[in-house]
Amino acid sequence: MFKEFKEFALKGNLVDLAVGFILGGAFGTIVTSLVNDIMMPPLGMLMGGVDFADLFISLNGTEYVSLVAATEAGAPVIAYGKFINAVISFVIMALALFFVIKGMNTLKKKEEAAPPPAPPRQEVLLEEIRNLLAKNQ
């Protein structure tokens, strides 16, 4: 039973999948940092100094200075700024994945388009003999 599990676990596809999950998690962290630390500050500055992560609506009618203050006060809030950041992260992740898959598909097509190898010399000779025999009959 252990041998079967070992064969299953070490198959190329399963190992590739595990590596993909690990790299995906790491890439997700990079994309989140790209959105929150690189893209959103200049975008917020262009929008009048707004930090998108701090955009929220207080549902109890009380106004709070920031999302942190509202959360600390226990107020129910809709943190739509965090949602905007998440949507932008998703779009960037989806675009990156699209380009990776598109590149892989292009490479696969190039591999498939390679001409088939020449038949072995024996086959060529046998075909010639067959053709000569058919011609003489």
UniProtKB/Swiss-Prot annotation:
InterPro entries: MS_channel (IPR001185), MSC/AndL (IPR037673), MscL_channel (IPR036019). It is a multi-pass membrane protein. GO terms for molecular function: mechanosensitive monoatomic ion channel activity. Belongs to the MscL family. NCBIfam families: mscL, PRK00567.1-4, PRK13952.1. Channel that opens in response to stretch forces in the membrane lipid bilayer. May participate in the regulation of osmotic pressure changes within the cell. HAMAP family: MscL. Keywords: Cell inner membrane, Cell membrane, Ion channel, Ion transport, Membrane, Transmembrane, Transmembrane helix, Transport. It is found in: Cell inner membrane. This is Large-conductance mechanosensitive channel. One of its GO terms (cellular component) is plasma membrane. Homopentamer. The gene is mscL. The chain crosses the membrane at residues 15-35, 81-101. Its main location: membrane. The keyword Transport applies. Disulfide bonds: none annotated.
